[in-house]
């Protein structure tokens, strides 16, 4: 994940996180070693824009007429950032000249405050990371230029350094990696970052999986080209693109945060509908599909809500096993009941599903499978007597197997599996 540390997380970031975290869980279940990483984009002009915005909002605490820079972040999140800065520094920087040194102070504060909130929101959302990599630190520790100097297909033009990404016909134009004024581009850092990650894996079969918003689709081929240009295999980097999301409520699009006047934040949405509902809905859709997140539908506690059906089936299985009272039931009898056979058939699909998702990265296959399994279990439950039946233990073993798979599938999505509802 790599949301800029310039504000609060929104629903688009949540889709990235939900897909990525679930994919990591599935890959680990399939036997892979997985490293979860957050790339902190703290090098570049967006950080200066944030610093300028916080400084202006801070000055407005003392002088409401203090102007906002035209090219700045005007959302209410910068007001909250400025208030947090004031809570620490009071009037220490009131009316100071806005020099480069002062900008660095506001920039550093903004980055740390944003990252702190991002980590908190992700943790509440059930997403944690093994590594945080700072882009600014990559430059400070000279980890960018060695890779850039090893590129084979660069050339100079108009004072800038270009990478010949049109070679092979997969990009529509060559790309600047170092501007004529000596500043590096975002692409420059991306080139070095991906090589560094592969080297850190220290595995000839290691693979990097990036998850990007579809608005970055134009970057895919140039990143893969640079990866190959450095001598790495193209199949060692996979870039998944996810489409945009609209938030809907009462049939209308919810565009704005009531508190901040910007995009609806993940924190606000989670408070309204809960993390489980967000995660399920975002994972249930193909990456390639634009989705409408309907707040009314995801909060329904009835048969119209797939997540509710799955959770209810798990709770039902737990309750039935409690009534049977056999701790480790063993299937010793042939199950000739058609509903039991259907349930067995569904359960047999689970290992193959895990293998398929680990190979294709299609985590959206998991929710419909769990829904199908839940419906098969509900039919079994409604049409089969378990308690006191002649083959009670075998039927109870089937119920327990269903409970285990439902719980495991929900766990892969970091969604609660309730024992009572």
Question: What are the roles of these predicted feature ranges?
Answer:
Residues 1-421:
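Non-catalytic interaction-recognition regions
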């Amino acid at each position: 994940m790599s949301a800029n540390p310039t504000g609060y997380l929104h629903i688009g970031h949540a889709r990235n996180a939900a897909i990525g975290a679930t994919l990591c869980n599935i890959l680990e279940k399939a036997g892979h070693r997985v490293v979860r990483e957050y790339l902190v984009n703290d090098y570049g002009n967006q950080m200066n824009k944030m610093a300028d915005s916080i400084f202006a909002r801070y000055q407005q605490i003392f002088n409401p007429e203090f102007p906002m820079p035209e090219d700045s972040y005007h959302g209410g999140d910068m007001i909250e950032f400025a208030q947090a800065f004031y809570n620490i520094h009071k009037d220490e920087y009131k009316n100071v000249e806005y020099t480069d040194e002062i900008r660095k102070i506001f920039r550093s504060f903004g980055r740390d405050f944003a990252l702190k909130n991002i980590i908190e929101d992700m943790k509440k959302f059930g997403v944690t990371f093994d590594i945080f990599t700072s882009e600014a630190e990559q430059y400070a520790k000279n980890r960018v230029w060695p890779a850039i100097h090893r590129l084979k297909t660069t050339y100079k033009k108009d004072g800038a350094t270009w990478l010949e990404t049109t070679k092979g016909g997969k990009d529509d134009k060559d790309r600047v990696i170092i501007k004529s004024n000596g500043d590096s581009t975002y692409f420059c850092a991306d080139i070095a970052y991906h090589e560094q990650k592969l080297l850190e894996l220290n595995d000839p079969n290691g693979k990097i999986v990036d998850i990007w918003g579809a608005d970055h689709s134009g970057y895919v081929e140039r990143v893969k080209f640079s990866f190959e240009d450095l001598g790495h295999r193209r199949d060692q980097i996979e870039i998944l693109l996810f489409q945009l999301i609209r938030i809907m409520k009462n049939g209308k699009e919810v565009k704005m945060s009531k508190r901040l006047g910007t995009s609806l934040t993940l924190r606000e949405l989670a408070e309204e509908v809960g993390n489980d509902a967000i995660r399920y809905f975002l994972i249930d859709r193909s990456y390639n599909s634009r989705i409408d997140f309907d707040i009314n539908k995801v909060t329904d506690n009835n048969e119209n809500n797939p997540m509710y059906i799955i959770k209810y089936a798990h709770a039902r299985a737990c309750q039935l096993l409690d009534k049977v009272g056999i701790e480790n039931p063993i299937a010793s009898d042939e199950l000739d009941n058609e509903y039991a056979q259907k349930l067995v058939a569904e359960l047999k699909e689970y290992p193959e599903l895990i293998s398929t998702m680990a190979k294709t990265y299609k985590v959206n296959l998991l929710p419909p499978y769990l829904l199908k399994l839940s419906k098969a279990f509900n039919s079994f439950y409604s049409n089969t007597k378990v308690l006191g039946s002649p083959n009670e233990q075998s039927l109870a073993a089937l119920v327990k197997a269903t409970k285990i798979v439902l719980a495991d599938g929900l766990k892969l999505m970091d969604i609660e599996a309730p024992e009572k509802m």
